[in-house]
């Protein structure tokens, strides 16, 4: 399997997992901020960027976690600080739940909790709507429609342009595979399996209409000892929208986790 990625810096690895309508390059400001202290690695998930698709038609969160394990092995990363955003949270939580010895800390941002607990009819409707938008509009058209909803009311035009750029680059098959995974996963089941000793934090925006604050709080509620932080005014794409505040929260958390 081929995986495209961005890498910068030396030291303890910090691994970044993007969301369903995104790409490794969306983390460029996070990478730049942390490269002086960490070896920062952001992958393009399977089916994104130049990464090959997963071989199964409807991969599970476990399949993405397995792919991440292989990728990290190839990178020589035995353990890391792990961060997931949105759909990336599902991959990160599954990886941490099944390979806790490889995770030094876990940060979940703008949590996509998964839809496994919804009625089957509702799950299928949401899946059809998501895949249907991409089929009807194409990646660029979908980005024009969806990207504005990922930002808070005070977001800059630059943040919107960056969102449209990454969302407009998705590949339909990889996006469809990720959408199926979202439809069949329950992140709480994985979070409940995390070892109590694992440092964890949740970061979310109070203006997020994609994964609303209560959804993030619900996940935090089943994660004993987790630190939960809200960024006022931030929408779903909080690390693009308010990079200074986001990076400060992450830096403070990592400082405590490595002390």
Regions found by a protein language model. Give the residues of each.
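Conserved alpha/beta-hydrolase catalytic His-Asp/Glu region
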Residues: 117-123, 136-193
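Short beta-strand/loop motif that positions the catalytic acidic residue
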Residues: 194, 202-204, 208
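Catalytic histidine-centered segment of alpha/beta-hydrolase-like enzymes
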Residues: 234-243, 247
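Active-site loop/oxyanion-hole signature of alpha/beta-hydrolase fold enzymes
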Residues: 6, 29-35, 41-84, 97-98, ...
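Active-site glycine-rich loops that stabilize anionic/oxyanionic intermediates
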Residues: 19-22, 86
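Alpha/beta-hydrolase fold catalytic core
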Residues: 1-15, 35-39, 77-78, 108, ...
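Flexible "cap/lid" loop of the alpha/beta hydrolase fold
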Residues: 93, 97-98, 103-136
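Gly/Ala-rich beta-loop-alpha elbow adjacent to hydrolase catalytic centers
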Residues: 84, 88, 92
